[in-house]
A protein has these predicted regions:
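A short SAM/SAH-binding and catalytic strip from SAM-dependent methyltransferases
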Residues: 116-132
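Conserved SAM-binding motif I beta-strand of class I
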Residues: 75-81
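C-terminal substrate-binding/active-site "lid" region of AdoMet-derived donor-dependent transferases
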Residues: 130-193
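S-adenosyl-L-methionine
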Residues: 1-49, 82-119
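Conserved SAM-binding loop of SAM-dependent methyltransferases across substrates and taxa
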Residues: 60-73
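Conserved class I S-adenosyl-L-methionine
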Residues: 48-60
Length: 200
């Protein structure tokens, strides 16, 4: 994967201007970046026609920037995170696309956020309870494609809903799964599902 040098410079601006540089740098840890590149590669391999994307648990906006580099035909990405410190950082990381009107970072609770999208991504499934997840799932537009990621990294206190393995993640995710896989990183396994809502 190639990243535009202008985007890399904006990444450095985001880190340099951040009040908590170490926390911002966590977005660029090897496991974090590998998981996001893995996701973008899979979408690029088989899902055509990415238009409007909403990323929940968007954190500092690195996934959005990677997706724009892999798929320049993307119309828009909205990155939603409940942490208010993420919004300015994410807008800086994606400054080129923000200036073009293609990117927006939003501070909001994913359980209450209303939207329309062709593709919905949540790479932070381990950070929310099952009840929060199911509330969030119920708000997803019916025809949207869904991409979910979680892991088996139970050691972090903020990881309150990890999966023991890929099948455990499938079971707790409650979607019609069309693709599933796992990625071994240095410290944990990353799980990913692609699918759609189960319709009543």
């Amino acid at each position: 994967m190639k990243v535009e040098i202008e985007d890399v410079l904006f990444w450095m601006d985001a880190i340099r201007n951040s009040e908590d540089r170490y926390r911002t740098l966590e977005s660029f840890w090897k496991g974090q970046v590998r998981s996001k590149v893995w996701l973008s590669d899979q979408l690029n391999n088989w899902y055509i026609g990415l238009k409007d994307i909403v990323i929940f648990g968007g954190w500092n906006g690195v996934l959005a920037s990677i997706l724009f580099n892999v798929r320049p035909d993307i119309k828009s990405i909205t990155s939603v995170d409940i942490d208010p410190t993420c919004e300015e950082i994410a807008n800086t990381v994606n400054k080129r696309y923000e200036m073009e009107g293609k990117f927006k970072a939003v501070t909001a609770d994913m359980c209450n956020y209303k939207y329309n999208a062709h593709l919905v991504i949540n790479t932070s499934c381990e950070h929310i309870t099952q009840q929060q997840y199911e509330t969030w799932l119920s708000n997803i537009p019916e025809q949207a494609m869904i991409v979910l990621q979680s892991n088996d990294y139970f050691e972090l206190d903020e990881h309150i809903r990890c999966a023991t393995d890929l099948e455990d993640f499938v079971e707790m995710s409650k979607i019609n799964v069309t693709w599933k896989a796992e990625l071994q990183t240095e410290k944990y396994k990353r799980f990913m599902l692609i699918g759609q809502k189960i319709m009543d």
